Amino acid sequence: LNRREPPLFPNFKHLPVAYHGRASSVTISGAPCRRPWGQIVRPGADGPSFEPARMLDYEMEIGAYVGVGNPMGYPIPLAEADQRLFGLCLLNDWSARDIQGWEMAPLGPFLSKSFMTSVSPWVVTMEALAPFRMAAANRGADAPALSPHLNDPTDRLDGGLDVTVDVYLLSERMRADGLDPALRSRGYFRKNYWTVFQMMAHHASNGCNLQTGDLYGSGTVSGPSREEMGCLLEITDRGALT
């Protein structure tokens, strides 16, 4: 209703557009990733073709596990979020960029991400992370005022986390040649715009009931420099750089 022309996105007549988050394809780190198939529009093509993805990517994220949920209809105040979060893990949100580029309008990625998500086998509890708590990141002078459900003095004081995440690349050829993993990027979660507690409070702000064991991702941990970017899409500027 908000879009006048054209009334439908180009992909509407080619696939049933959808968006979801899927728990069944969350796997422990080390499980093999099979290249997904999907609809892809190649440069110069008149329409999509169904074929294997060529632009398989990773996204380095922090995963957060809910410890204590909330009843349906009752939001989680931001001031309580740190008492409800159990712990954090590493999360790789595998992404097929060429599938994603075609399917994501207007609802976001669907088959380009649902094929697999990897998480570390260990969960670091919030108690263990207590020494690494710090002030939330500076949102900048031009940042709008925080919505009331995302604004709490305690979160601003120590909602941030001084956690560094490294991405190493070890290809099949590198293994065969006996080479060590190569550091691809290093991200700093302390720079994240939103805290993990704000994410929880926002998720439940409409009364959505979170449950013990629920997992949510932080989004790609990236920074302004190329060395801090947490996915190949950003590092290569959509394939323009090597």
Language model: regions and residue ranges:
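Active-site pocket scaffolds in enzymes
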Residues: 193-205, 211-212, 216-242
